[in-house]
Amino acid sequence: MHVIRTVYNDDRESRGHVSKPLRFVTKAAPEHQIKGCYSPQARALGRQGGFQEQMNVSSFLNRPDTDDTLQNIRKEYLNTKRNLHDLLSSSPTRLQQGARGAGEMSGNAPPLHYVGGQAEPPQQGEQDDRLRQQLRDYMSNKSRSMPPPAKYPAPGPGPADGGVQRQLDSQKMMIESLKRELDTQRTINSMLFERLDRLEEEVRYVRHSNRAPANGAPFRSVSSAPSSSHTNGHVGSYASADDTKVLLGWDQPTLAHGGKHAQPPQQHTRTFSNLDDSTARLIQMSAGGKQKW
């Protein structure tokens, strides 16, 4: 057994539609509970009691004065809807701004227009204008609220620039090595120039010794000039060990042990001259340095 409850929907009346009754089905007591009674009379009384209870509940719910919760919700909803409709219909400018603000805050689609009780979407031109206006407002608000971009340090060279950086480092190392080699060459050149100056000085000495006999100065030949390297420590060795002075006539030989009975030293024939020896060494050193570098 079922009890049918009829409720009218008043919300659709504000939209111009005819209200249609809504039917809710309420179930009575289950049959197995009714069959569980001990006697047919008790079962009949149970059925009648269940029916009476269902009728009382349905009549209580159908009375609007007792259903305070549902009635209050309906009233609040209808009042709010009526106020919103009056507000939107009285101010077209505020309608557009309010719709735009609501769309920005909630992210919903623009509101629908009701024509003849049916919802119709807005025109394409109006929707484009609203979208453009929303975009302008968003960009202006973003430019005001956004702080200036933070400055980050420049990133280092990436993997693609690693080869270029290695080439630059290798070229710098080559330049440094070339600089060191240039400094070494400059040092060698300065040493060679110094040796050349000494060689020129020795050549001038030789020229002076060749011109000395013509001017009347004493002259000793290179072959007969005594040499301290061939005396081998005899008694009659010279006190001065510089044979070059004796060769050039700048010094006279003196006896190391003077006296009456002192015998003159035995002169040994020279096989080479100290001056020739030093000059030849300088020439060989200069030639060897040039060949080396």
From Swiss-Prot:
Keyword Metal-binding (UniProt): no
Positions with biased composition (Low complexity): 116-125
CC per GO annotation: central plaque of spindle pole body; cytoplasm; nucleus
UniProt GO molecular function: structural constituent of cytoskeleton
Keyword tags: Cytoplasm, Cytoskeleton, Nucleus
Coiled-coil region: none
Keyword Cytoplasm attached: yes
Compartments it resides in: Nucleus; Cytoplasm, Cytoskeleton, Microtubule organizing center, Spindle pole body
Biased composition (Polar residues): 264-276
GO aspect biological process, one term: spindle pole body duplication
Stretch list, region Disordered: 87-165, 212-238, 254-276
Stretches with biased composition (Pro residues): 146-158
Family: Belongs to the SPC29 family.
Role noted for this protein: Component of the spindle pole body (SPB) required for the proper execution of spindle pole body (SPB) duplication. Links the central plaque component SPC42 to the inner plaque component SPC110.
Protein name: Spindle pole component 29
Native source species: Eremothecium gossypii (strain ATCC 10895 / CBS 109.51 / FGSC 9923 / NRRL Y-1056) (Yeast)
Source lineage: Eukaryota, Fungi, Dikarya, Ascomycota, Saccharomycotina
